[in-house]
Amino acid sequence: MLLAQVNRDTQGMEFQSVDGDPQQVTLCLTEAVTVADDNIDGMDTVSLQAVTLVDGSTAYIQHSPKVSLTENKIMEGQVIQLEDGSAAYVQHLPMSKTGGEGLRLEDGQAVQLEDGTTAYIHAPKETYDQGGLQAVQLEDGTTAYIQHMPQSNTILAIQADGTVADLQTEGTIDAETISVLEQYSTKMEATECGTGLIGRGDSDGVHMQIVLQGQDCRSPRIQHVGEKAFRCEHEGCGKLYTTAHHLKVHERSHTGDKPYICDHLGCGKKFATGYGLKSHVRTHTGEKPYRCQELNCLKSFKTSGDLQKHTRTHTGEKPFKCPFEGCGRSFTTSNIRKVHIRTHTGERPYYCAEPNCGRAFASATNYKNHMRIHTGEKPYVCTVPGCDKRFTEYSSLYKHHVVHTPCKPYNCNHCGKTYKQISTLAMHKRTAHNDTEPIEEEQEGYFEPPAEAIDDPGLMYTPSVVDDDSGSEQVSGSEIMGQHHVALISQDGTQQVLSQADMQAMGGTITMVTQEGTTITIPAHEAMLSSGGAHSVTMVSADGTEGQVAIVTPDLAAYQTEEGELIQDQEQHEVSTSPHPVTLLATSNGTHIAVQLSDHPSLEEAIRIASRIQQGETPGMDD
């Protein structure tokens, strides 16, 4: 235990070491302890050592700061001649917590520090004044409050072990002890450390810092309430934060330190913050405490941030604007904006290291999804009983969920019609309202992926390049309101409409690679799009086998079987040639079931109806 006594009348200071070998202590007047006493104009830096006299009393030897401490080193057991002629010897004094022997802390104020140590502030209690509290910023960055007493003595004691509760049970703390430990709120003034000089603030009194000899003396920080006074010293950074804690968390982004580890069996992921770990644990527990309050939405999320981003899909709020002049686009999240900005700069910082690949990506999510093409990994599985479909992308899984739900989250702002997929909405707006305004990918928020799986809004599909992240694809052709379209429909249900000009640019055929590695080729000539009697399409498999796929017209039966073994398991192909769209489903046993829909086609609705037909049911067209 270290006891420091300050006598303000004489400016003298006394330190006593009672928990180990006698040690020298230096009082360095700098930053952390604030004492509002305008009568103190200066204070000398001194070094003191406790000695025990032969009669059992204790004396203190003061060393002049102008003399080297090593020249006055006093060892335990050494006999010292005092000024009055008596002899004294240096002796270790044990600290007794139970009273009787040693020093007892009477009438003290307890301060629990962040590093586990306990500080006690003692003063005569007969002049206790609630309004006399002064803020104390400790060396570890914490803030405590002490009461300044106008009497001649104030004692600050720091005990290396023990807690406040220990002393309370022993009856050593007075009932009038002040409760402390508030957050940072004191205004500090920078002073030179180690000079022994006292720095005076504008109105805050004297600033002091107690430094044990041998410790480094750090430059103090200046903090004003509400200001960002903590600066990151990492080269090229310089970000400011309001508290030392926030700065410490930020610095982990430079050091890579992740002290929070998931203890779930087989996981072991690490995180830089406790909040990040807490959010991650919910992926194991399934807890989603943050629920959307929008009527008929029913979505829940693991974090408040995910809920906030999802809510913007209802409100249309896009607070994050692109800073590039002439762009004018805005986004629901800062991360989407960051990825979008790379479409202006051309930056693609994520490179595939696989041999003979060399692809680069603007977002980490697309990079991770691409790498699964090389590894074959499909970690995201549909949990609906009997489905068990797997996907390389988290977002693809959530978009797939519309197959199993009646929800239609995407609505037309012109007529109010609702759709399950944003691609279907886009086609409706182009054909029915001549609205060619692109629909932002970030609006696909109903099944919104978590923050680490946000799709790259800058990822563009081109007519001549098919994104190889999609696994397998299907083709649809439709004639709506006199306009011809061909749509590439990926396995997860997303759809990209191609014009005839796009088709011509692609050449004579459309070749698709399924997730099993087989190839399906479909002719892309104009005759395919004609409504005048083209009721079948030739499909060619990888081994050269050809087969005719029938197109069911409105006056035919609800389904029709056509021979052929070229269709792969669970592949869906949509072909429409009449003003009343028809959807063709290829089942796992090679049976082709065509379902006519009364409204604009939806691949998911067709699959649902066709599945019921395959099971022997005869659902109506409005099912």
Swiss-Prot record:
Superkingdom classification of source: Eukaryota
Pfam families xrefs: zf-C2H2
Residue ranges covered by zinc fingers (C2H2-type): 230-254, 260-284, 290-314, 320-344, 350-374, 380-404, 410-433
Cellular component aspect of the GO annotation: nucleus
Alphabetized PROSITE patterns for the sequence: ZINC_FINGER_C2H2_1, ZINC_FINGER_C2H2_2
Record's keyword annotation contains Transmembrane: no
GO MF annotations, alphabetized: DNA-binding transcription factor activity, RNA polymerase II-specific; RNA polymerase II cis-regulatory region sequence-specific DNA binding; zinc ion binding
SMART domains according to UniProt: ZnF_C2H2
InterPro entries in the record: Znf_C2H2_sf, Znf_C2H2_type
Localization in the cell: Nucleus
UniProt cross-references to SUPFAM superfamilies, sorted A to Z: beta-beta-alpha zinc fingers (SSF57667)
Alphabetical keyword list: Activator, DNA-binding, Metal-binding, Nucleus, Repeat, Transcription, Transcription regulation, Zinc, Zinc-finger
Any one GO BP annotation for this protein: regulation of transcription by RNA polymerase II
UniProt record similarity statement: Belongs to the GLI C2H2-type zinc-finger protein family.
Function noted in UniProt: Transcriptional activator. Activates the gene for selenocysteine tRNA (tRNAsec). Binds to the activator element (AE) motif of the selenocysteine tRNA gene promoter.
UniProt-recorded name of the protein: Zinc finger protein 143
